[in-house]
Amino acid sequence: MPELPEVEVTRLGLLPHITGRRIVRAVVRHHGLRWPVDPALPELLAGLTVTRLLRRGKYLLIECVPEVEQSGRAADTVGGWLLIHLGMTGTLRVLETPVPPGLHDHVDIELAGATGVHVTLRYRDPRRFGAVLWHAGDEAGLAEHPLLRNLGIEPFDARFDGDWMFARTRGRRVAIKSALLAGDIVVGVGNIYCSESLFRAGIRPTTAAGRISRPRYAALADAIRATLADAIARGGSTLRDFVGSDGQSGYFQLEAFVYDRAGLPCRACGTPIRQIVQGQRSTFCCPTCQR
């Protein structure tokens, strides 16, 4: 499943290709994703211009606004946001030349630039666990969308630090890994990067969240940011289906300290990496380096 780094890599890859372009048309071939695609989406998008491409957690947010100076548009035309979640196998690709759609290519958005050159933003999702949703309105209203309003703080937000984590885990008996995956303390730290961050901080993933000290949370906050930044710089992790918007695979997984390295020697101390199961998810850790 694409995690925060993979979504951010996708955002950065799409940014120069779609911002400032006008949507010529949209084609929805399959409406049955995790949540149904609005049948009116092609009509809602036609003529709007992409002005911003943001990320909130694992959601891509594409701002689409009307060109008010354009003649012939209805006076009540409103802009809004596309909310896109890649699910487990979703990808977004920019096509600069026509490519016939495949079986799993569900949504195409054709965009025109100032020079008239068209590109196509194509959403592909073999397992259909992703989402392409429309939210009419401004950014303030978007923040209250049911899928976004309860998300935790962004890991690169200046407010996110050890004090933030310490204050929000007092009295919690749940294991720290499970607490991080819940997404209400900090958003976007999925299974891969959770194992990696806990290793970098030297914290055993089964430790109760409420028993971790303030200094150790400071180390964990730093480890989370460093791990995610490294993953973004390396193009994310390619475990099964993920590729960036240019079709290239990420390679963070090749340099992982613990993830998917069960039985192999720890890169720091040589102890065999241990694999356990927490909440039906595989966890990897070093029994010597993490305590």
Swiss-Prot record:
| One BP term from GO | base-excision repair
- Read off the InterPro entries from this record: DNA_glyclase/AP_lyase_DNA-bd, Formamido-pyr_DNA_Glyclase, FPG_cat, MutM-like_N-ter, Ribosomal_uS13-like_H2TH, Znf_DNA_glyclase/AP_lyase, Znf_FPG/IleRS
Under Gene Ontology molecular function, one entry of this record is: damaged DNA binding
Give a yes or no for keyword Lyase in this entry.
Answer: yes
Q: How is the cofactor bound?
A: Binds 1 zinc ion per subunit.
Q: What is its EC number?
A: 3.2.2.23, 4.2.99.18
ZnF regions (FPG-type) run across 257-291
Top-level taxon: Bacteria
Q: Which residues bind DNA per the record? A: H104, R127, R172
- SUPFAM superfamilies for the chain: Glucocorticoid receptor-like (DNA-binding domain), N-terminal domain of MutM-like DNA repair proteins, S13-like H2TH domain
Listed cofactors: Zn(2+)
Q: Which family does it belong to?
A: Belongs to the FPG family.
What is the annotated role of this protein in its UniProt record? Involved in base excision repair of DNA damaged by oxidation or by mutagenic agents. Acts as a DNA glycosylase that recognizes and removes damaged bases. Has a preference for oxidized purines, such as 7,8-dihydro-8-oxoguanine (8-oxoG). Has AP (apurinic/apyrimidinic) lyase activity and introduces nicks in the DNA strand. Cleaves the DNA backbone by beta-delta elimination to generate a single-strand break at the site of the removed base with both 3'- and 5'-phosphates.
Q: How does it assemble?
A: Monomer.
- Record-linked PANTHER family: FORMAMIDOPYRIMIDINE-DNA GLYCOSYLASE
The protein in question is named Formamidopyrimidine-DNA glycosylase
Q: Source species, please?
A: Ralstonia pickettii (strain 12J)
Q: Which gene encodes it?
A: mutM
